[in-house]
Every structure is written in C-alpha cells, then in structure tokens.
Amino acid sequence: MSFNFRIGQGYDVHAFGPGEHVMLGGVRVAHSHGVLAHSDGDVVLHALCDAMLGALALGDIGRHFPPSDERWKDADSAQFLQHCDGLLRERGWRVGNADITVICERPKVGPHAVAMRERIAGLLAIELDAVSVKATTSEQLGFTGRGEGIAAQAAVLLGRIAA
C-alpha cells in the first residue's frame, strides 16, 4: 500500500559552553553561552533534519553528517537542512509543514520565532504558515531547567510531490 503522506519526529540537544550566542533555526541569538557541538550546534535545524530523515527512513543526522568527519566542523546547519530537503525531493517528497518546540530556560525564543520561521521557510521553499516555532521551559527541572543546555523537538508532515 502506498500513502501520499509521511510523518517524522526529531529531537536534538546540546550542552551550553563558551560563547556569546546560539544558533536557533538558522538565526544567531545573543546569549550568555554558546553550545558544545561539532557543527554550529543549531538544535532547531538538527531536530528538523532528523524529523525529515526519519519520515522516509533515511537514518539520522549523525549518519549523514558524522561528528567524526572534519568537513562538518563548525558547519552552518542550514547546509544540513538543504541536503536533507534535497534527499526528500529526489525521492518525490517535500515538507508540507513543520512544528518545532525549543526547550530551554534561556535564551528567550519568542522574540526570534518569526525570524526563525522565515529562515526555515526560505531554506525549504515552503510557505511561512507551514512552519511553527514555539518554546517552552522545563519548569527548572532537568538539564535545561538548570540552564545547562538547550533542546528542540520537531515534527514534520511530508507530502508527495505531484508529478
């Protein structure tokens, strides 16, 4: 049986480390810390990539962009997203919509959510209203609650591209 839709779910987390900003959804956000990561550590784009790859059973971001590969050292995660989008389109699929949740105490995501939505929609060549970015805290529980790191969850609906 063949379906015209696929659903994917992704998750990413990074610990805070030295730095003065974090990348979130392709947007540079000022913060008291950076993140510890091989690439730019954009948890939003990483979770989104995993959701896209998972929807078509294409593995995960670590398989496509392993941290052991120096090509991806300090890489812009927008490259990862565009690569994943290309894999989908080669197979006749595209993102219909994406719903992303950032989990952290700080930085505050709300003031940057529209810019993040615009960046993601632009990278995927989809409508702005097909991208949702929101944030929540963990009520000071766990590593995000203690301010030790940041996490993101993403869900995507893929649709077949009409021939």
From Swiss-Prot:
Pathway: Isoprenoid biosynthesis; isopentenyl diphosphate biosynthesis via DXP pathway; isopentenyl diphosphate from 1-deoxy-D-xylulose 5-phosphate: step 4/6. 4-CDP-2-C-methyl-D-erythritol 2-phosphate binds at D12, V13, H14, H38, S39, D60, I61, G62, T136, T137, S138, E139, F143, R146. SUPFAM superfamilies: IpsF-like. A divalent metal cation binds at D12, H14, H46. The keyword Protein transport does not apply. GO terms for biological process: isopentenyl diphosphate biosynthetic process, methylerythritol 4-phosphate pathway; terpenoid biosynthetic process. Its cofactor is a divalent metal cation. HAMAP family: IspF (MF_00107). Involved in the biosynthesis of isopentenyl diphosphate (IPP) and dimethylallyl diphosphate (DMAPP), two major building blocks of isoprenoid compounds. Catalyzes the conversion of 4-diphosphocytidyl-2-C-methyl-D-erythritol 2-phosphate (CDP-ME2P) to 2-C-methyl-D-erythritol 2,4-cyclodiphosphate (ME-CPP) with a corresponding release of cytidine 5-monophosphate (CMP). This is 2-C-methyl-D-erythritol 2,4-cyclodiphosphate synthase. It comes from Xanthomonas oryzae pv. oryzae (strain KACC10331 / KXO85).
